[in-house]
Amino acid sequence: MKRYNIVLFTLIVCACSVQAQTVEPITYKQYMHKVSADNLEYAAEKMNVSAAHADVIAAKVFDDPSLSFTYSNNEDHTLQMGQSYELELSQNVTLGRRTAGIKLARSQNELAEIVLDDYFRNLQADATIAYLEVMKQKQLSDIKRSAWSNMYDLAKSDSIRLASGKIMEVEAIQSRLEADIMYNEVLQAETDLKQAYMQLSLFVGTTVTDTLFHPVEELKKPEQVFVLNGLIEGAIEHRSDLLAALKNTEVARRELILAKREKRPDVEFSLGWSHNKRVRNEEAPAPAFNGVSAGIAIPLSFSSLNRGAVNAARFRARQAELQYEQMCLQVQREVMGAYQQFQSQALQVKHYEGGILKQAQDVLEGKIYSYNRGEVSLLEILNAQRTYDEVQAQYIETLFNYNAALVELERNCGIWDIKG
């Protein structure tokens, strides 16, 4: 009896170590709200959209004009040939390059927004699976604890029966050993649960030493009916990574246009004003006068004969189109695979709920009743207990796999209607 009191005390201490942290019950809706609001990686990804928006603003900037001032002295102190001042304002004009740059920046900004949507699509799916994992580990831990409790009670009963001479010592020892083995399984289940809690904290941006979020729901089988053709059509139309690939083809075309525009020569327009002072030289006197000038400068763009940059942009545009076509095929394959996996898991859950659980429980209860009456051996009890535990654990795993398959199906289809 003292041995089992120590074991029970140890379990209580383990539970208290978890409770030393703040354990906060949380619903799936609250959890997903915290993920969208507090996930640090998602917050970092949002900066890409802000940066792309800033790039659009930067692309609208015009080239700065140039203002020059020139002073000339024609040996005025010695020959009295006068002095002159000249102001010139010049402006460089790009022939369509700025407009192409603005359109490219806008397309890149739209691409960044779609990529952010795709990041959140994967984030909410991964976060949901982590939430399901905690529920699974919690229920598996409860199964292990219940099995240990049953064996613990049986071992205590065997100790009493041994003292009264109803069973042999070896049977009492074996029941104690089985209880000890199950206790180790309980400890491992508790460890797995703690690790699942830590993963959940990572998604909501809290430290594991601060708060542990405990899902209030349990694994269940939500009824969902899907039509494969509709799923494929919806995925091609709505899936964010496919939309990003399509937008990337637009970005590549914009880059090609910009590469062509950059081959155009820049034209520089200038406007000047000058003032010449009076020339007092006796041989060539001249009055003071003002002058106005206007000019245009066109560079000789021999470098535009090199078509390397344009050809590279053209190849990238074609590459983006091929990548989009390949992704369309890949999306169809992923949707079909996820649909088949979901259908398989649904059948497995239905099979378990068809009576296997109830049968395993009835067998165990019958064996325990017969054992207490001395009609069956301890080995039969252990076999029935292991069978019942395995059936329960496999059912929980199957429920988890069903829900995870549903998450993956909706992830691959680009839809999301999971409410928890």
Predicted regions and their residues:
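Hydrophobic, lipid-facing positions within transmembrane beta-strands of outer-membrane proteins
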Residues: 83-89, 231, 290-298
